[in-house]
């Protein structure tokens, strides 16, 4: 995307010209080489997972980001690969719930981000991100609702099928978090465009802490 068009992104080092493209390219190549060599020495599967993340990121930057629906699926799949890489490096079982849960949460967040960008940039949205000319607010709202529902269903099924039988009592707290984030997207909060800013929303932060504490207690019962 053309960050120079986006009022929130044009002050970034590359977009503003503070860091020159050749230096950024050199730094990227250096860090990539060091990272992949380090990953290969640690674990072969970890190496190939990181390589997959890099390849998908490159394909996304080259053309996947311009294709309707493929853009959000590619981003979400990359999040799944990151989670798998983490599971591999700490040598834990890669649960199907981990894969499906993270995939749909990523779709939920990415769709919300697209909605926020479309709402914020209006007629300039397609100049910033070409794929936005294909998306409409009603379409993104529908997708957002679908993914929100799927996330709740997945967590509910996971809770009922879990060996921790009391975990089902955490469902209402989880639903609140999804609904709160849904509200932030619908109200055109900056969090829609920048999910990392979710920590600035006090109800969401408090709700998350309560959910984590309740879940830990229920798992220990």
Annotate each PLM feature:
Residues 1-16, 111-138, 187-193:
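Cytosolic, membrane-interface loops and tails of multi-pass inner-membrane proteins
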Residues 3-50, 96-107, 142-153, 203-219:
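Multi-pass membrane catalytic core of lipid/isoprenoid biosynthesis enzymes
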Residues 20, 182-210:
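Interfacial loop-to-transmembrane junctions
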Residues 23-65, 150-183:
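Transmembrane helix-loop-helix
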Residues 35, 92-112, 162-175:
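Alpha-helical transmembrane segments
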Residues 35-39, 57-61, 82-90, 113, ...:
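Structural signal for membrane-spanning alpha-helices in multi-pass inner-membrane proteins
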Residues 73-89, 104-106, 130-139, 198-211:
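Small-residue-rich segments of transmembrane alpha-helices in multi-pass membrane proteins
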Residues 135-150, 167-169:
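A loop-to-helix transmembrane entry motif
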């Amino acid at each position: 995307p053309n960050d120079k068009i986006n009022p929130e992104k044009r002050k970034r080092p590359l977009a503003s010209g503070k860091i020159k493209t050749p230096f950024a390219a050199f730094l990227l190549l250096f860090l990539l080489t060091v990272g992949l060599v380090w990953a290969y020495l640690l674990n072969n599967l970890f190496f190939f997972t990181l390589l997959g993340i890099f390849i998908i990121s490159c394909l996304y930057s080259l053309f996947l980001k311009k294709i309707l629906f493929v853009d959000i699926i590619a981003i979400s799949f990359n999040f799944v690969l990151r989670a798998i890489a983490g599971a591999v490096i700490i040598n834990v079982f890669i649960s199907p719930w981990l894969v499906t849960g993270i995939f749909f949460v990523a779709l939920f967040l990415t769709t919300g981000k697209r909605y926020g960008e479309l709402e914020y940039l209006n007629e300039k949205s397609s100049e910033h991100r070409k794929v936005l000319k294909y998306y409409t607010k009603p379409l993104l709202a529908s997708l957002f609702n679908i993914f929100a529902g799927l996330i709740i269903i997945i967590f509910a099924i996971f809770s009922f099928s879990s060996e921790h039988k009391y975990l089902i009592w955490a469902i209402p707290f989880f639903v609140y978090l999804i609904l709160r984030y849904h509200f932030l997207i619908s109200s055109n909060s900056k969090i829609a465009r920048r999910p990392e800013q979710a920590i600035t929303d006090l109800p969401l932060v408090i709700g998350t802490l309560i959910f984590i504490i309740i879940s830990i207690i229920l798992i220990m019962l």
